[in-house]
């Protein structure tokens, strides 16, 4: 099968955008980073580089910029005595933060298109027989769907604060949803997978009875049920996993070019170009003709017709497989 390589991170221009970002980025690193495993997916690779350990932000920055530029960048929710050990038992687990993952595409039905990047035809299979290349898929992420994900995050925060007395932090994932994280120490950090499963099922509303006739302002599930909240849509496997990798706050998501960003005020969050660090303009060459919503804007593309567009939008479109960024214009 032919290989079509000018997409997702294989462009040298996209790499230069990412490298310039990481030269000065203030990554949100834990204060015990020497106990965390770091991992990344480099440009041009489908596999992860794991079992990395760093003792300072400067050491990490040097590695990212000069050795392995990341398309995706993570650290472990777990703390380890030897985070760089390749054997998981040898790492010696010391406890983990508590994680929740909300994917907007699990909440909404999103429009998706599979197409050939050479001829531009819509194709349902993974290969275009005519051009002998792999097809690409584009999934449209709408602001309305992101809003629904944000509402799930709001409900989750309420449960964790009111019912468990925890102090969760909410992060935009950089692509299609939200991560909710509780920095855990002591007993919280030592919760095993079964105990975390109980928490996951609780916030999802598993086994919670109905409370007909209750007050909407009542505390706990009585009030939630009477406000129409039956549970939070999370990926339970993320919460159960005590050795999960977390996207590093203020890193870039390799499928969008957007920043993994803490949302300190849920009421102020907007899914728009402000989530991108990139300025100036790009020349973008579309693979297909399409009208689509991009970061809360309606964008019209014509196959093979280059357009000058904001870098935030052009890089997003490139990483979403809709075409190529051909040039940067200040």
Swiss-Prot record:
Q: Which GO terms describe its biological process?
A: DNA replication, synthesis of primer
Cofactor(s) recorded for this entry are: Mg(2+); Mn(2+)
What Enzyme Commission number does this protein have?
2.7.7.-
A single GO molecular function term of this UniProt record: DNA-directed RNA polymerase activity
Which keywords belong to this entry?
Answer: DNA replication, DNA-directed RNA polymerase, Magnesium, Manganese, Metal-binding, Nucleotidyltransferase, Primosome, Transcription, Transferase, Zinc
Its family remark reads:
Belongs to the eukaryotic-type primase small subunit family.
The record's note on quaternary structure and interaction partners says:
Heterodimer of a small subunit (PriS) and a large subunit (PriL).
Annotated protein name in UniProt: DNA primase small subunit PriS
Name of the encoding gene? priS
